[in-house]
């Protein structure tokens, strides 16, 4: 008599779902993974284009007085914090992935929250790829109109994804979570 093979354990969130709900959850995950992949590819493409077409340190105006593309290499984080400390970025990126994975498990039926986590993940992957390949991140977007307030930040598409993702998560925490608690 043949022994029945034990079934492969499913992630905690999927164990309590019915088969149709599990299929819907798997499809939902696929959509978010595809969105993240498109964002990572877009980030990769923009950075590659800038490295090829704009010499290091040079700028090209996109909208005069508003935004330009300035090719720089950033070995730090936002505002050049932790400059040159690559080990710090490797560790924090891996920790960020672990935290996002834990938060994802508890985010069933929270699409706004999940989109925030997806954006954060895509941005983290985009910058992580640069750090692994070059030991720096290619930044390019310079908001000229902020220079008058001595805010001379230059950032990349991955940074935009991370920032928008954090905004999505904060909006969920401040507004949507309260609605769910009342219901």
How would you label these PLM feature ranges?
Residues 2-183:
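Alpha-helical transmembrane bundles and membrane-interface segments of multipass inner-membrane proteins
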């Amino acid at each position: 008599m043949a022994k029945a093979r034990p079934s492969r354990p499913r992630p905690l969130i999927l164990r309590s779902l019915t088969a149709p709900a599990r299929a819907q959850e798997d499809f939902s995950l696929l959509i978010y993974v595809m969105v993240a992949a498109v964002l990572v590819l877009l980030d990769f493409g923009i950075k590659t284009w800038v490295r090829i077409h704009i010499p290091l340190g040079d700028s090209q105006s996109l909208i005069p007085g508003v935004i330009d593309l300035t090719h720089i290499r950033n070995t730090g984080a936002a505002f050049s914090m932790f400059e040159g400390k690559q080990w710090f970025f490797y560790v924090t990126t891996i920790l960020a992935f672990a935290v996002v994975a834990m938060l994802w498990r508890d985010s069933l039926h929270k699409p706004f929250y999940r989109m925030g986590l997806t954006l954060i993940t895509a941005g983290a992957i985009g910058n992580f790829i640069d750090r692994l390949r070059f030991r720096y991140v290619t930044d390019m977007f310079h908001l000229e109109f902020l220079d008058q307030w001595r805010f001379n930040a230059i950032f990349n598409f991955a940074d935009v994804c991370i920032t928008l993702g954090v905004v999505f998560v904060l909006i969920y925490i401040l507004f949507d979570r309260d609605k769910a608690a009342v219901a």
